[in-house]
């Protein structure tokens, strides 16, 4: 089996594995009693990650350079990054909902690369002179890892909004599963909690397979309301987990994005004599940086938690895709891949 045949097998296999894994995670969410499904899902993501890594390694051997020279290779590197960050996020959160929302992203990326791109864009070709630099690996790989990390963090924020049904629930805990839960007006729902003799409220929840206790602030009985959309203790526990993990993952992706932009500026100065030329890709990279900088600023200095930062992070998901793919497919600028829908 030659390298080209191996690559064709691996790209289609990666797509099929991720498709099956996505269905397994969805089935696990629909039937939580089937404890084998989360294990199968995690194994599927790990196998897909290994398959994509083997594909990229094969491309490296075939072309003799780090496989990030065209859209096909960068898409699979992005999918590899998403699956790698997924495994980290799932281990941190111990929640199968991570796979429910991340596997569709990884599967969609591999489907686009393997099934939609023209054949001539999937073949390995010699590097153009401008890309024959050690900065190719430093700049592009770090940027792609930052995109993957920020996408996972953003999609977890979207999952938070879905779990909370868009309610302005304030999560005031710094550790996973131990926060206090309040809506915007500082009220909680009677159906969510059990009042203790001292006036505090205890909510028992089994959000991720184990029973935990969240102790809420002491409240006046007059503030207990039942007219708000019902959110169970399980949903609140899960929302707290998603909010916390999304914050941590974005906190990891933002420094990677910063390093990638700086490395790109240094490379641009070496290649073209200018650190910044307001190329469309550079402009959108700056916009992406500003969006997630605003998110982290709101979380760290303003103390935002819950719906408002989640909306900001969710908008960042779209911005990352525009920066990575939308600008490239316009066929303009130094970062264009020259292919149109």
Swiss-Prot record:
One of its GO terms (cellular component) is plasma membrane-derived thylakoid membrane. InterPro entries: Cyt_c_assembly, Cyt_c_biogenesis_CcsA, Cyt_c_biogenesis_CcsA/CcmC. One of its GO terms (biological process) is cytochrome complex assembly. Pfam families: Cytochrom_C_asm. Its main location: membrane. It is found in: Cellular thylakoid membrane. One of its GO terms (molecular function) is heme binding. Belongs to the CcmF/CycK/Ccl1/NrfE/CcsA family. May interact with ccs1. This is Cytochrome c biogenesis protein CcsA.
